[in-house]
Amino acid sequence: MDFKEYRQRGKEMVDYIADYLENIRERRVFPDVSPGYMRQLLPESAPIEGEPWPKIFSDVERIVMPGITHWQSPHMHAYFPALNSMPSLLGDMLADAINCLGFTWASSPACTELEIIVMNWLGKMIGLPDAFLHLSSQSQGGGVLQTTASEATLVCLLAGRTRAIQRFHERHPGYQDAEINARLVAYCSDQAHSSVEKAALIGLVRMRYIEADDDLAMRGKLLREAIEDDIKQGLVPFWVCATLGTTGSCSFDNLEEIGIVCAEHHLWLHVDAAYAGSAFICPEFRTWLRGIERADSIAFNPSKWLMVHFDATALWVRDSTAVHRTFNVEPLYLQHENSGVAVDFMHWQIPLSRRFRALKVWFVLRSYGIKGLQRHIREGVRLAQKFEALVLADHRFELPAKRHLGLVVFRIRGDNEITEKLLKRLNHRGNLHCIPSSLKGQYVIRFTITSTHTTLDDIVKDWMEIRQVASTVLEEMNITISNRVYLKETKEKNEAFGSSLLLSNSPLSPKVVNGSFAAIFDADEFLAKTYAGVRIAHQESPSMRRRVRGILMSGKQFSLDSHMDVVVQTTLDAGNGATRTSTTNSYGHTTSAAQANSERQASIQEDNEESPEETELLSLCRTSNVPSPEHAHSLSTPSRSCSSSSHSLIHSLTQSSPRSSPVNQFRPITLCAVPSQSQLSMPLAMPLPNRNVTVSVDSLLNPVTTCNVYHGKRFLEPLENLAQTSASFSSSIFRLPTPIATPTRESPEDPDWPAKTFSQLLLERYSSQSQSLGNNSSTESSSLSGGATPTPTPMSSLDELVTPLLLSFASPSQPMLSAHGIGEGQREQGSDSDATVCSTTSSMESL
């Protein structure tokens, strides 16, 4: 092939590559071939004479592509990303054409010089201390591009071994290196990558694995205990590997604690951030990097997530002389006149020759810039969050580990066999590709955002495939995953979890429950929209709306989980006021399909039946003097008296839907509650002082529903944000005040919070604005303001009392309700939030 033909074939190859990447979504992700398939397609010996290029290239599609696992496919979710980009491909095209071997500065000065600059750029981008950078010719630290993170780990372990042997000789002269090496011990988490174990095998040193905590992280305490125990046995601890972003679950070792322990015992601390290191270019993810100042080395792979194709691993060391001592060999033919002054990277690695990798990294950094790469990282995290929400919305699945960055691990509840069968079936179908992992004995599926082409539509499509195959597998195995859970079991999993998840109070039920709880019923279909968004194409019966309506109209008190599934139910005995409590099937317990179907049909029938309470309530709705459907609101009967120690009352506020028939006007959707003041160290109005908000979460603090009561608008807010803004936000289920339980004084430390209910504020406002209110109403309002228990008010009179007030509160032209009645300042501050509300709501609906 001459230059003329090369130009032609080169253009054809560029077109082929562009077409391949542009249309990769159409290809099957995982190949449908068997081992040895290619032997039948190719001859046993190489051709004697050369073949024309068209014939060679035609065999790419015929022979090679059928056996390719398409790592750039948006439906590829196995392993960690192995991304590429056009600037990266162009960089290696040029580097391969130049084909220089930059083992010394003299062998190719530009190769070495550009690598030094690129490594400084990358180090500054992820926030490394200056001690790790090439800042001057006298600088001891610096960075180098290695082939893989495995090689980087081995280099650092061997360097740490050399330093440890030298120090041992200084303290105890007379020992042979082999004798000292036999005593050396290295440490890592039991979640560390297999390359750490392989490095220890090559280095002929012992590797001790530290058990990870419940968050799958290695902590300083257990590491210190292991080190001290080994010292007592005459061993020599010398090296620790901390992992930031484990392969199994993307968990993070506590680098700060580990660094302190390593400093105490003078151990080499290596940080393996192969995947997560790319995310550190975003400042919000650098919290995991705290303690890096105590590390001796750190490595991550730009070839994983920074749009640079394989191979490219960035390694920084604090003391390059320790690496030089380990790999320093200088035969005469490798020496040059600048030896000792210029950087010779052959002393920083195991092989001698090295590729011009810095060129493609340089092309990518200049083409995308820091902001462009940050957008890419954040988009991957956003898509992983979307997938996490989809998994959480299906009760058959669970997340055995917290999601970090772009990796989600999930499994079907129950035996490992079910999840294993699901994964095998998914990979056999070939429409998406995932791999398994084992987390503390649980078989899990890893789902990683691995492609620059992945969109939300791809994520939804893959999730629908997973759900469909899961349904088939469960049906074949005659297994039904129960979505009900013993409250006792929930409390055992979380000691801080209270005695109830969520209290649902029927508007007509006079029963007494814990006075610290309140229920808000919202008929604006907010939760229905949210629920539909995260449970795409949800087809299970009974429907969410029917189930919640049936619960509320049944006259029973229920505890519910975050998916509105029954946990414990308490039924009032109308005869003597006693309660009866019954529990349901155990969490994750499997039942036969026939039994589950029978229970489901019974639940549907119960929900469809119109109870006497519902009939009476609908009758009141039709006969009461309620305004037009566009503005209709009503307030239910308050519950009977609670204990005097509680200053909050239970009320049910029902807002009718402006577009619904009378039957649906009392369709409660959002349920919220407030903890008693004994559970609070401070009022939790503090995080959002100018908003009336409610939060609904599950016992594991998974994603929540946050409602902002500004003119009927709603928005979502992550639980993490709330937890970070309030020190008293813990694992309690409802930790923010609702409009019907608000502070009564200016002081945020008011010990009597919450003291007033929504109806109390309504009555106070009515008293101040209406001269027509009789003495009885004034007396009742005064009694309520003092925190005393109100006399039960008949539905008709209460409806006549509050309807005009509800209409005025709902009107955008009216001031917002505050803890002291009406506050103009709150309404003005609330207007700024409205924009956020609209924006967030639109984003939520787009899901």
Swiss-Prot record:
EC number: 4.1.1.22
InterPro entries per UniProt: Aromatic_deC, PyrdxlP-dep_de-COase, PyrdxlP-dep_Trfase, PyrdxlP-dep_Trfase_major, PyrdxlP-dep_Trfase_small, Pyridoxal-P_BS
Regions annotated as coiled coil: none
Catalyzed reactions: L-histidine + H(+) = histamine + CO2
Acidic residues composition-biased segments: 606-616
Entry's Gene Ontology molecular function annotations: histidine decarboxylase activity; pyridoxal phosphate binding
GO cellular component, one term: cytoplasm
Polar residues biased stretches: 575-605, 832-847
Keyword Lyase attributed: yes
Role played: Required in photoreceptor transmitter synthesis. Catlayzes the conversion of L-histidine to histamine.
Family note: Belongs to the group II decarboxylase family.
Annotated protein name in UniProt: Histidine decarboxylase
Natural source organism: Drosophila melanogaster (Fruit fly)
